[in-house]
């Protein structure tokens, strides 16, 4: 009873009463002593008007063993931790939850984030306020013991060693991660010079995931699984293929890159390397952008490649992982952003920050480059190629549409299928309509063969 009254007083911020009742809890039971200790630690945190540097150092002096606690490795065939182990972990988590909330409320967004998340979770919902606060923390010369603890515990990327088949951590500097993060955001915003400036700060050995691993394939006819060792894959920073400037002939995320992506005009730009780091990619885009400003056939091709890049890196594109801080284009939560209303994970702290990725596609950069390419070229084959690329962006806009008429039609989709199709044709098929004028081109026939949407359109409208 006295323990419960002490806890209720704590929640009501009656700290003197909390201390009075806690002093009366004299049971020698391990469970009671553990619960009493939890309330004592929470009381110590609650009494702080602000979590200061001196208090952070004090926390680590008194409670380092609690904060550094990790579950022990279980023996083979044992699947549950002991009650004592669970109590230790619960105590650690309670302390971190309270601290996370306090940091959130006092505006220390960087530490509020790191308490509950590995740094790479920032890629699920990029937030400049958190990024800038982490940048201040990184540049702070006299970090507290608790700040050092957070950086050491959270600035890493959980990975899998495919050779040993064991989980592992990839360690890197906070400054490298933040420069990569900011540079990637700038790249998506077409701020190429700012992106380059950030990428130049990075140790070029930096990476956040493995570049070599097994690819598994299941043969349903033989009912056997095979695995192939692949190397030089995207590792979060390196090995970006030059095909990122190509276009996808077919819609298939799990198909081989060579089967999906075609690369017209790419070999005319020798400065684009076959595999690139983000810095090398940015340098190539800066050069392409310079050429794209002219009014020549070469400029048209440069604009076309840039337009492809910005479509390919939307969540509809084959290389959707690049600007979303993902490892590959598998169907992860960051790419399920159509049809649902995004909800913030919490209004109290940043726990579970990685759930519910929030990426809203912007098709304007791709469309602007492609329209410039269309206006700059006299080549009919290329014009047809560009219209097909524009039609993909137009389809993306259809997915993004918040049109109230369309929303009402979808409320009874089964009965309104014909009306939905008519709405789509009237409002989101202008590039298909224009592409029909290029039926005498080679690329037109290729598009009809590969894209069943377009094939259906040409046969019915």
For the regions a protein language model found, what residue spans apply to each?
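Extracytoplasmic/secretory-pathway proteins
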Residues: 2-461
